[in-house]
């Protein structure tokens, strides 16, 4: 008999999402559980291959949309010369670099993904975080365990 813990893990994520009032975990885990338990399972490899990139695109659209709606303005060039703005630019560069280290690590050592997911779920469910953590966490982890 071949038993998979994936459905149990997804149900656990759904329950954690409901208890912690975190819609992103609840919806994501529900969609994946439905895909796994139906004929939609054939599309899981497609989601696995392109989901991260599509998620980053949607996240970027969400971050940039206030510029389009007028709720946020592009600051004048002079404002880029203050400490907060320069710090924001360098921190953005650093975090993007960290995530860039994390993606290859997740591909080279997929067993670590489980630990990163558990940590991310705990951070999202109980600490008010958002689920962009696995990439950054993998980047930080790459310093601990090496690049691959």
From Swiss-Prot:
Main location class: membrane
Transmembrane region(s): 13-35, 50-70, 80-100, 121-141
Location in or out of the cell: Cell membrane
Name of this chain's protein: UPF0756 membrane protein NMA2160
Lineage: superkingdom: Bacteria
Key words, A-Z: Cell membrane, Membrane, Transmembrane, Transmembrane helix
PANTHER family linked to this entry: UPF0756 MEMBRANE PROTEIN YEAL
């Amino acid at each position: 008999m071949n038993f998979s813990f994936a459905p149990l893990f997804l149900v656990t994520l759904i329950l954690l999402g409901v208890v912690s009032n975190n819609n992103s975990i609840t919806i994501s885990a529900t969609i994946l559980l439905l895909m796994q338990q139906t004929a939609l399972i054939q599309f899981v490899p497609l989601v696995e291959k392109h989901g991260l990139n599509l998620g980053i695109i949607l996240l970027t659209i969400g971050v940039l949309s206030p510029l389009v709606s007028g709720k946020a303005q592009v600051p004048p060039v002079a404002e880029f010369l203050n400490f907060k703005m320069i710090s924001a630019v360098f921190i953005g560069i650093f975090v993007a670099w960290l995530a860039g280290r994390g993606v290859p690590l997740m591909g080279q050592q997929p067993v670590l993904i489980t630990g990163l997911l558990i940590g991310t779920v705990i951070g999202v469910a109980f600490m008010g975080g958002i689920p962009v953590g696995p990439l950054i966490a993998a980047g930080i982890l790459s310093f601990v365990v090496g690049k691959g």
